[in-house]
Amino acid sequence: MSSKLPTTLLRRPSALPSTTTYTAYSASRPTPPSCTAHGAQGQQIRNATFVPRHRRPYQFTQLVQLSDGSTFTVRTTMPTALYKSAKDSRNHLLWQPSDKSLKNVELDEAGKLAAFRERYGRGWDLDAKMTPEEEAAAAAALAAGGGAGVPGGKAAKKAAEEALLAKKKKEEEEAAKKAAEAEEADPFDSLTDLISGYATENMNPGLNFKETRHYGKKK
């Protein structure tokens, strides 16, 4: 005959707080004083306050090198010891007019400019006057670019066309210059021409508005 286990061992312990009261313990322990409304009002509460302070990050001593080679030191938060500035006021044509690296040199290694001029001419070039040395160098570069893989007759023809276009452009500039000088000499002539271009001839002189209106209706 098997023995029966007690039921208290098989019962799962509960997570809820026990409701059993111990009268002997509660009687011997003094009860805490209850907090009244008057006591809650009289108690002072001090909360923490934020005190604003200036942020002072750590700064490093940095050496700044400009494009012309000059250097100076600054205090900055960047930890880099040497900073090479590529954009500064000294890297400008007005500050360094004799610097060769700042000159606008035309590089046509792929031959795109030569192909454009061959198709559309030199009317899109800048109006800056070229020195004889630059003109000779441009003519030599054009001949070298046109002669590569092209017969000599074609290169000579292109050179002749370029010379003709340059001559025509020069003549147009001279004509425009003469016209501007003529306008500066007598500005009233140009104003008179402008007014006369918009003026209309009066076909019925000596008639007022009413007579002019009925002039065409007379038989």
Curated annotation (Swiss-Prot):
Pfam name, any one: bL31_N
Location(s), subcellular: Mitochondrion
UniProt record, GO biological process: mitochondrial translation
Source superkingdom: Eukaryota
Keywords, sorted A to Z: Mitochondrion
Region feature (Disordered): 169-188, 200-219
InterPro entries referenced in this protein's UniProt entry, alphabetically: Ribosomal_bL31m (IPR034600), Ribosomal_bL31m_N (IPR048874)
Single GO molecular function: structural constituent of ribosome
GO terms for cellular component: mitochondrial large ribosomal subunit
Disulphide-bridged cysteine pairs: none
Keyword Mitochondrion in record: yes
Subunit architecture: Component of the mitochondrial large ribosomal subunit (mt-LSU). Mature N.crassa 74S mitochondrial ribosomes consist of a small (37S) and a large (54S) subunit. The 37S small subunit contains a 16S ribosomal RNA (16S mt-rRNA) and 32 different proteins. The 54S large subunit contains a 23S rRNA (23S mt-rRNA) and 42 different proteins. bL31m bridges the mt-LSU central protuberance and the mt-SSU head.
Function text: Component of the mitochondrial ribosome (mitoribosome), a dedicated translation machinery responsible for the synthesis of mitochondrial genome-encoded proteins, including at least some of the essential transmembrane subunits of the mitochondrial respiratory chain. The mitoribosomes are attached to the mitochondrial inner membrane and translation products are cotranslationally integrated into the membrane.
Family note: Belongs to the bacterial ribosomal protein bL31 family. Highly divergent.
Protein name: Large ribosomal subunit protein bL31m
Organism of provenance: Neurospora crassa (strain ATCC 24698 / 74-OR23-1A / CBS 708.71 / DSM 1257 / FGSC 987)
